[in-house]
Swiss-Prot record:
Keywords: ATP-binding, Magnesium, Nucleotide-binding, Transferase, tRNA processing
Reactions it catalyzes: adenosine(37) in tRNA + dimethylallyl diphosphate = N(6)-dimethylallyladenosine(37) in tRNA + diphosphate
Function of the molecule: Catalyzes the transfer of a dimethylallyl group onto the adenine at position 37 in tRNAs that read codons beginning with uridine, leading to the formation of N6-(dimethylallyl)adenosine (i(6)A).
Membership in a protein family: Belongs to the IPP transferase family.
Lineage of origin: Bacteria, Bacillati, Bacillota, Clostridia, Peptostreptococcales
Residue numbers binding ATP: G10, P11, T12, A13, V14, G15, K16, T17
The EC number(s) this enzyme carries: 2.5.1.75
Single biological process term from Gene Ontology: tRNA modification
Pfam families named in the record: IPPT
Ranges where the record places region Interaction with substrate tRNA: 35-38
Top-level taxon of the source organism: Bacteria
Assembly and interaction partners: Monomer.
Annotated binding of substrate, by residue: T12, A13, V14, G15, K16, T17
Name of the featured protein: tRNA dimethylallyltransferase
Amino acid sequence: MKKKILMLVGPTAVGKTETSIALCQRLKGEIISADSMQLYRHMNIGTAKPSLEEQQGIPHHLIDIIEPDASFTVADFQSEAARLIDAITKRNKFPIVAGGTGLYINSLLYDMDFTSAVSNWNLRQKLQKDAQLYGNEYVYKKLQDIDPNAATKIHPNNVKRVIRALEVNYESGENFGDFKNDIEKNTCYEPLLIGLTRDRSELYERINYRVDQMIETGLIEEVKNLLDCGYTPELIAFKGLGYKEIIAYLEGQYDLEEAITILKRDTRRYAKRQLTWFNRYQEIQWYNLTDQSSSNIIEAILKNVEGYFNLS
């Protein structure tokens, strides 16, 4: 029997945390975080991680599970989420997957086999070093030369994805796009995919406010503490929004005002990319939080869930 899951997605700062908690309270659910930054311990402010008080007693999974220098792949998420969905279902609770990391959502929606995923750690490290020494454009030019089709679909500054495309090509001889085309829907789950959005002006105001709050509540001190603990700026965890900008400020690349301006701008751009990603899902059902009160949205989603899964 397929396991029922509610998937709640949307851009950063849209209101996923509050909405997912409210839904859990009504559905007797537990939350599985699909946020690649909230995995890390000691990184609370910059990841907008819900505090214990904000969690309101609702079980949250895949938050605070690894150190900032540890690795956690999409395959790891897929495996852990599958285990959690099974355990939550067996407890007669309702699994709610909530977050904005598109690849994590993909790994549950589609039958993606990571056990045979092509990888070459030595090559990856060399390409990462090339990007650091010669710049993002250097490795992007390599991709343009060997897989121009993939290069048109990947931003030059998305170094992680550029390197992954090169890795796939070097190891398999296949183009990155071809490697991804055989994906079919995951038959283990019966997902209801709900997307949260807001009018752009309101979303951007919320993003700007969130950044200001992060600074006021100690983001700079959080980053300093992490660096003082010996975590280095080269870590993948520090490539996340909020951390890379503050590290650049601490290194003297920007003054604080400029760092905050850049962080707000980059977060708005990230939200736009998230919306573009989630709009690709034909099955997604969108709810605009600007149009209605949060309580009305909750009731509308609950009615949808009950009808979709025949819960009434």
